A protein has these predicted regions:
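Sec-dependent N-terminal signal peptides
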Residues: 3-11
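N-terminal export/targeting and maturation segments
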Residues: 13-75
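Long, charged/polar, surface-exposed segments that mediate recognition or autoinhibition
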Residues: 66-122
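Secondary-structure transition/turn motif
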Residues: 73, 153-158
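Low-complexity, intrinsically disordered Gly/Pro/Thr-rich segments
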Residues: 124-141
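Short, exposed beta-strand-loop hairpins at the edges of beta-sheets
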Residues: 137-146, 151-153
Length: 158
């Protein structure tokens, strides 16, 4: 009886990693929010929705997207040609400084120096080729290795 009780106590102490269970690979859901000029070949992403209080005037909920998106070499280049604003500056993120809320599959790309950070302006300020039409939000693309882009988006939904 003690062994069974000890087993259940131990099992209740182990927390499942929710991040790993929520990773999607079907690009159709991702394409509901992000409008890229080229086809996505492969993607791993999470979409989380946070309801806001009744006093919120602009949004009823915030949609957070963390995605790692793979493209062909030609499509990868086309994305950056079509970006309306590019901000290039050194970006150094060490493992110990990495934001805790980034999922592991995104976090692994932020362990070395990167020379480029591409931030795409949101629709609120000027036209944005990468969010769906009439969408308020902010989108950041980090180019990483092998024609892959990390995308972090916050979208306001009414």
């Amino acid at each position: 009886m003690r062994k069974i009780l000890l087993f259940f106590i131990c099992m209740s102490c182990i927390k499942p990693n929710k991040t790993e269970n929520n990773i999607h690979t079907d690009t159709k859901e991702l394409e509901k929010y992000i409008n890229l000029p080229v086809a996505i070949q492969k993607a791993e992403y999470e979409i989380s929705k946070t309801k806001l209080g009744e006093l919120s005037q602009d949004c009823s909920q915030i949609i957070e997207i963390h995605a790692v998106i793979k493209f062909s070499n030609q499509d990868y280049k086309a994305i950056f040609k079509s970006a309306n604003k590019k901000y290039n500056f050194p970006l150094i993120v060490k493992k110990e400084d990495c934001r805790d809320w980034y999922p592991p599959y995104v976090k692994k790309y932020f362990v070395k120096e990167s020379n480029e950070l591409f931030k795409i302006n949101s629709v609120v300020y000027e036209e944005n080729n990468f969010l769906k039409e009439n969408t308020k939000g902010n989108l950041i693309f980090f180019p990483v290795e092998n024609n892959t882009i990390c995308c972090i988006a916050s979208i306001c939904e009414k």
